[in-house]
Every structure is written in C-alpha cells, then in structure tokens.
Amino acid sequence: MRGNIHVKTNIIVFAFKGQLDAFSEKQFKNFITNNLKNEFSFVIDLTKIDFLDSSGLGALVQTAKECKKLKLGFSVVGNSRVAQTIKLVRLGDFLNLKSSLEDALNYLKN
C-alpha cells in the first residue's frame, strides 16, 4: 500500500493505492496518526484500493473514532468494491462514506 497527501481548501486528502488489509494496517495507521496533529478535517480516498479486509475496516473505524474524539471532520471515498464492503457491514454512515472526492469535500465544508 502506498499513500500520498494533498490539501484542498483546508481539508487534507489522503489517497491510498494497493490493499488495505492485515499486512498494511499498521502502515495505514502510522500514516494517519502522524498527520492527525494538523487539526484539519480530512478525507481518506480509497478509490485506488484493490482490496479491503476486516483489518482494514477496523483501521478505518479506529480512525473515525479518533477523529470524533479530536472533533475533526472525516469522510471516506471508495470505489465500488470498497463501498460495497463498507456497506455490507453497515459502516457507511459511521465512516461518512461518499461516492466521490467532490461529495466528500462538500460534506466536510458544511
């Protein structure tokens, strides 16, 4: 899994490629944790993730909880496979799942 960061109107966008699974979960958590200090709302863009398993879902849930605790806005964008997995376990609302980066950015601006 690889990730990069860019900022759009005071919202940090974390874009990831590859797989978010048991093998990459620690890397994902470290990447996010190191950037939570910025105190900006953020989007996790998973549109280029090929595979998401229960460990990846757990990392997303933990990230959402941490954001709520810090009062940071948070949203997830996923491709159809990622969205299907998130919806299957009924985490769409909790993770503020959006269908596009534009929708996620608009959600966080309001």
Report residues per predicted region.
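Amphipathic alpha-helical interaction surfaces in cytosolic regulatory modules
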Residues: A22-L95
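STAS-typified acidic loop motif
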Residues: R2-N30
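A short, charged, amphipathic alpha-helix used as a generic interaction element across diverse proteins
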Residues: L108-N110
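Short acidic-hydrophobic, aromatic-tinged amphipathic segments that line or gate anion-handling sites
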Residues: N96-S100
